[in-house]
């Protein structure tokens, strides 16, 4: 079967790889000059199979009000007269209950664990290198209240069989020795030892090369304009360089997916939540992280990527804008220099990307109401973590094969009739 994938980020490329392995003739179309040049370019570098939590959680509405007045706030809200933004926010608020949080977190952990297995197998069969490390994620707590509040995450990890360790201050330092200089600033942590780190951009580029060797055609520098539907199925995708036809189509355009689907009468509740990162050359390894440290106070991840530190995080709801705010950079700099001052900040690269977020935090993977049109989008902050599992799952769905994990609650249908997820 001929399959056209729209989008060459990590989700589009993993989808292409698995579809090609399944024997399909695959073409990937993207407006950029190569793979992973938008949201997949400089994300935080976490591959956090255990650290999967919905942003929509009990207490978040109250915390959000407090964050609005913080200098280094993890959440920035710039309201617009935008029905899509308002509807998305209302649905997200509806997911901020204990019951919804447990359901959504369980879905995320299921897909993340599947992706862990898929990534390990893919790494074995391809031997690609992407500055990967397998030393876990340390969620770092600066206050006793944060440590106490982590009990709900520990409960969910235990219920889903995800390995974890609750650490005191000294144990945190044994895991991340550079924290010794900041011991007075921390009280403890939660370690998920099976988590990994890696450069998503490097991974996606190398996997694109492997996919090309399997026959995948990458058509870069081609802007997607609209989908053509006739007789209940897609008959082509119109681009600035003509129309591409296929037997099946996969929309993997991240935050831009809803804009392509809306004219077809398909409402995909995905909205861009901007994140920021700094990539800092290491000058003193003894003051740098070994793996990923999640600074719970600022919701910022500090990750070791070879000879660089990647600092990423924050959530800015401001629509489709990639402008770089100086205040956001100061927050990233504050977090990393406070804990790991081993980089040359004068040579840091500042970046932003639009994460495609659903109101419940879980991606949308699978069929639509149009027979040959599929979606693989809405992974939010966990696109890198969930990429291999999502690509493999999508390939099974398109191929009509039995999926290896339950996927009914990952489908777009969970939002039918005004449901919240």
From Swiss-Prot:
Catalytic reactions of this protein: a D-alpha-amino acid + A + H2O = a 2-oxocarboxylate + AH2 + NH4(+)
InterPro entries according to UniProt: DadA, FAD-dep_OxRdtase, FAD/NAD-bd_sf
GO molecular function: D-amino-acid dehydrogenase activity
Gene3D superfamilies: D-Amino Acid Oxidase, subunit A, domain 2 (3.30.9.10), FAD/NAD(P)-binding domain (3.50.50.60)
Enzymatic class: oxidoreductase
Binding-site positions, FAD: 3-17
Signal sequence interval, chain numbering: none
Keyword entries, A-Z: FAD, Flavoprotein, Oxidoreductase
Recorded GO CC terms: cytoplasm; plasma membrane
Entry's Gene Ontology BP terms: D-alanine catabolic process
Cofactor: FAD
Enzyme Commission (EC) number: 1.4.99.-
Pathway: Amino-acid degradation; D-alanine degradation; NH(3) and pyruvate from D-alanine: step 1/1
Function summary: Oxidative deamination of D-amino acids.
Family assignment from sequence similarity: Belongs to the DadA oxidoreductase family.
Protein name: D-amino acid dehydrogenase
């Amino acid at each position: 079967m001929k399959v056209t994938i729209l989008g060459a980020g990590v989700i589009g490329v993993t989808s292409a790889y698995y579809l090609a392995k399944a024997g399909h003739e695959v073409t990937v179309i993207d407006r950029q000059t190569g793979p992973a040049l938008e949201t997949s370019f400089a994300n935080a570098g976490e591959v956090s199979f255990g650290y999967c939590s919905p942003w929509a959680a009990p207490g978040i509405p109250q915390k959000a009000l407090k964050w609005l007045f913080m200098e280094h706030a993890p959440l920035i809200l710039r309201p617009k007269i935008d029905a899509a933004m308002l509807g998305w926010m209302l649905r997200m608020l509806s997911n901020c209950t204990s019951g919804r949080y447990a359901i959504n977190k369980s879905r995320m952990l299921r897909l993340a664990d599947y992706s862990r297995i898929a990534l390990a197998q893919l790494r074995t069969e391809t031997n690609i290198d992407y500055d990967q490390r397998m030393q876990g994620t340390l969620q770092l707590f600066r206050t006793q209240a944060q440590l106490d509040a982590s009990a709900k995450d520990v409960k969910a990890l235990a219920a889903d069989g995800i390995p974890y360790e609750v650490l005191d201050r000294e144990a945190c330092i044994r895991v991340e020795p550079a924290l010794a200089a900041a011991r007075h600033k921390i009280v403890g942590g939660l370690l998920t030892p099976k988590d990994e780190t890696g450069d998503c951009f490097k991974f996606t580029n190398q996997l694109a090369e492997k996919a090309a060797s399997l026959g995948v055609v990458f058509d870069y520098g081609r802007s997607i304009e609209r989908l053509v539907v006739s007789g209940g199925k897609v008959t082509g995708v119109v681009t600035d360089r003509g129309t591409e036809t296929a037997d099946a189509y996969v929309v993997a355009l991240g935050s831009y997916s809803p804009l392509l689907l809306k004219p077809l009468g398909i409402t995909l509740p995905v909205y861009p939540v901007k994140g920021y990162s700094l990539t800092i050359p290491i000058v003193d390894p003894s003051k740098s992280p070994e793996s990923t440290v999640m600074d719970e106070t600022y919701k910022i991840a500090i990750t070791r990527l070879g000879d660089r530190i990647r600092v990423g995080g924050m959530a800015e709801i401001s629509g489709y804008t990639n402008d770089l705010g100086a205040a956001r950079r100061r927050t990233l700099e504050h977090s990393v220099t406070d804990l790991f001052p081993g980089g040359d900040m004068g040579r840091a690269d500042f970046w932003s990307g639009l994460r495609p977020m659903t109101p419940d935090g879980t991606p949308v993977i699978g069929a639509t109401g149009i027979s040959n049109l599929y979606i693989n989008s809405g992974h939010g902050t966990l696109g890198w973590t969930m990429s291999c599992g999502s690509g493999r799952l999508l390939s099974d769905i398109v191929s009509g094969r039995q999926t290896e994990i339950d996927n009914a609650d990952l489908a777009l249908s969970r939002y039918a009739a005004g449901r919240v997820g």
